[in-house]
């Protein structure tokens, strides 16, 4: 019971201390190695521990004995304490989005002269887990500092690319339809191939018996589908030119909503303002110096003229 109360007291001290975290960025599926070195190298290390905010205990370690808590196992988090207990290292394997957060490592140290007094040292590490298709440099340039911001930035970029591709596909289909209506209609069956963006093709089949042309439905890609039907009538050569302008029915389920794109603006830092202030001050000093030189020469001439008059 006494040992349990001591552990609870130590945990409360660790969680109420103001953190000074070090940030580490990794990608989904990678392994992350977190390490801490203690400053007090003269005391005797009683125990080292690792926690994850807000209130999750990962492990407690005393020399080579390691005890895991809160469903953590050695398969997920491996522990190592090299350099004669001067450092504590954990490796989190196969990172997921749930592994992102603030980790705390703590050392519980006692003096060799006074074993009843226990000192502690703790260090904070922020682990950021980025999606596999977003690099750390892209995340920094976009202004994303947290896991949720990085995921939101990736989704906005994907939606913007999808909207651009959809618009280009619509333009290509419109041009193809106009070209079809202006072509000469043959009395025999024929098959025409039309190219659509991304190397996708569909066939147009003409049947003189039914007097109609049908354009097949494009294969579905993601959630965007395009269905186009063109109806025309084939007649004899006498009234061929009177039947060209037949109604064309085109149905499309292309979304027209354009997602907003967030643009990050550059903010001036304190060093920028100091540099601007220094340049302005230098310009003012040069102006004052030029004014003094001009004033000196002008006053010298006036004194010389007064001397000549006298």
Curated annotation (Swiss-Prot):
Region Disordered, residue ranges: 153-195
PTMs per UniProt: Glycosylated; contains phosphate and sulfate-substituted glycans. O-glycosylation is required for hemagglutination and hemadsorption activities of infected cell membranes.
Membrane topology, Intravirion segments: 301-310
Intervals, Virion surface compartment: 17-275
Disulphide bond pairs: 36-105
Locations listed in the record: Virion membrane; Host membrane
Keyword match Lipoprotein: no
GO cellular component: host cell membrane; membrane; viral envelope; virion membrane
Major subcellular location class: virion
Record field: compositional bias (Low complexity): 162-193
Residues bearing attached sugar chains per UniProt: 39, 113, 133, 203
Annotated SMART domains: IG (SM00409)
Chain ranges passing through the membrane: 276-300
Domain Ig-like V-type per the UniProt entry, residue ranges: 19-121
Keywords for the protein's UniProt record, in alphabetical order: Disulfide bond, Glycoprotein, Hemagglutinin, Host membrane, Immunoglobulin domain, Late protein, Membrane, Signal, Transmembrane, Transmembrane helix, Viral envelope protein, Virion
Pfam entry (one): V-set
Membrane association type: Single-pass type I membrane protein
N-terminal signal peptide: 1-16
Subunit structure: Heterodimerizes with K2. The heterodimer A56/K2 interacts with components of the entry fusion complex A16 and G9. Interacts with K2 protein. Heterodimer with C3/VPC protein; disulfide-linked.
Purpose of the protein: Prevents cell to cell fusion by interacting with and directing the viral K2 protein on the host plasma membrane. The A56-K2 complex associates with components of the entry fusion complex (EFC) presumably to avoid superinfection and syncytium formation. Via its interaction with C3/VCP protein, protects the infected cell and probably also the extracellular enveloped virus from complement attack.
Name of protein: Protein A56
Species of the source: Raccoon poxvirus (RCN)
């Amino acid at each position: 019971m006494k040992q349990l109360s001591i552990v609870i007291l130590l945990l409360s001290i660790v969680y109420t201390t103001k953190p000074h975290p070090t940030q580490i960025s990794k990608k989904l599926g990678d392994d992350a190695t977190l390490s801490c070195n203690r400053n007090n190298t003269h005391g005797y290390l009683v125990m080292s521990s690792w926690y994850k905010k807000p209130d999750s205990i990962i492990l407690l370690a005393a020399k080579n004995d390691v005890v895991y808590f809160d469903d953590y196992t050695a398969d997920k988090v491996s522990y190592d304490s090299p350099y004669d207990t001067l450092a504590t290292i954990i490796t989190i394997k196969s990172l997921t989005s749930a592994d992102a957060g603030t980790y705390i490592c703590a050392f519980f140290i006692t003096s060799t002269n006074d074993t009843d007094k226990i000192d502690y040292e703790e260090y904070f590490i922020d682990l950021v887990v980025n999606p596999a298709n977003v690099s750390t440099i892209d995340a920094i340039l976009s202004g994303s500092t947290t896991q949720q911001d990085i995921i939101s930035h990736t989704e906005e970029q994907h939606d913007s690319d999808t909207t651009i591709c959809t618009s280009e596909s619509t333009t290509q289909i419109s041009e193809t339809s106009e070209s079809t209506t202006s072509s000469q209609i043959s009395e025999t069956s024929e098959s025409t191939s039309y190219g659509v963006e991304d190397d996708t093709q569909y066939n147009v089949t003409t049947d003189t018996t039914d007097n109609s042309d049908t354009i097949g439905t494009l294969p579905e890609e993601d959630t965007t589908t395009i269905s186009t039907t063109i109806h025309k009538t084939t007649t004899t050569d006498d009234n061929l030119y009177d039947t060209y302008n037949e109604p064309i029915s085109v149905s499309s389920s292309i979304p027209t909503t354009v997602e907003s794109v967030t643009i990050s603006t550059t903010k001036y830092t304190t060093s920028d303002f100091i540099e601007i202030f220094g340049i302005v001050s230098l310009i003012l000093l040069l102006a004052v110096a030029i004014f003094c030189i001009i004033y000196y020469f002008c006053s010298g001439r006036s004194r010389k003229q007064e001397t000549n008059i006298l």
